[in-house]
């Protein structure tokens, strides 16, 4: 894991754009926000950088559209930047940044904590490797 963290830090040091799925993976058609890994938030706090919350909403094409297009539709929704709160100590700052980023991502999907947790509880806890959507 240290290798991945160092690689992310190197990208930021070069002033490049860094996109990370804080859940550690992107599962197509998974409607909930899964638990986050804390590393990206720790890095954002260390570098004093904002998090730009984004969610991908997938939906299958309606029956008419399936005639012309067989791949599911995806919509990228970008939220407001979430900036580290410099009035907090480092540990609290990381936790707060993670919480506010998660809250913004759920808002973008139209979820609250309860409905998000119900979705997580109702869905399988395993992931079967899926085929690429673009083949």
Question: What are these regions, as identified by a protein language model?
Answer:
Residues 3-135:
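Non-catalytic C-terminal accessory region of glycerolipid acyltransferases
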